Amino acid sequence: MGDPRKPRKKWEGPKHPWIKERLERERELMGRYGLRNKKELWKAETLARRFRHRARSLLGLPPEVRREASRVLVESLYRMGLIDNPNVDIDEVLGINAEKVLERRLQTIVYKKGLAKTIYQARQLVVHGHIAIAGRRVTSPGYLVSREEEKLIDYAPGSPFKERAEEAAQA
């Protein structure tokens, strides 16, 4: 069974809570991506920060070790869809920000694919179980969708939205 792992917080809040520019930027991002609360935004910022930190730590390694480790990191980020090209330098990883992470959320991709009319409807469709990835129902709007899974997103089997879409396609 092994040792139980130590649970960690998945997010880190801002160091100073009342900076006007940051508050305005956060409100704008929450509206654009249909986030329910700032914690969801802070999770994305923390994830992006961790990737940037890993990339910075690779820069201090010897060249032969850095080459292999950076290739693994870049391929992983490419599969996640956070970078556009698998053959980029480690400097590209330093450009990852919270918006790139928010673009990969299931809620955002459902909206961008046109399965929902608004970003808020996209969240509701996901939470209510109307969206599936490769036939498996996913009810977490914050699920990070990989490049391979992005093509497999559709309405869930048995969803009334799927039936309506099929009827509209036949008509």
From Swiss-Prot:
Transmembrane segments: none annotated. Residues 104-168 form the S4 RNA-binding domain. It comes from the Archaea. InterPro entries: Ribosomal_uS4 (IPR022801), Ribosomal_uS4_arc (IPR022802), Ribosomal_uS4_CS (IPR018079), Ribosomal_uS4_euk/arc (IPR005710), Ribosomal_uS4_N (IPR001912), S4_RNA-bd (IPR002942), S4_RNA-bd_sf (IPR036986). PROSITE patterns: RIBOSOMAL_S4 (PS00632), S4 (PS50889). One of its GO terms (cellular component) is small ribosomal subunit. One of its GO terms (molecular function) is structural constituent of ribosome. GO terms for biological process: ribosomal small subunit biogenesis; translation. Keywords: Ribonucleoprotein, Ribosomal protein, RNA-binding, rRNA-binding. Part of the 30S ribosomal subunit. Contacts protein S5. The interaction surface between S4 and S5 is involved in control of translational fidelity. Belongs to the universal ribosomal protein uS4 family. One of the primary rRNA binding proteins, it binds directly to 16S rRNA where it nucleates assembly of the body of the 30S subunit. This is Small ribosomal subunit protein uS4. The lineage of its organism: Archaea, Thermoproteota, Thermoprotei, Desulfurococcales, Desulfurococcaceae.
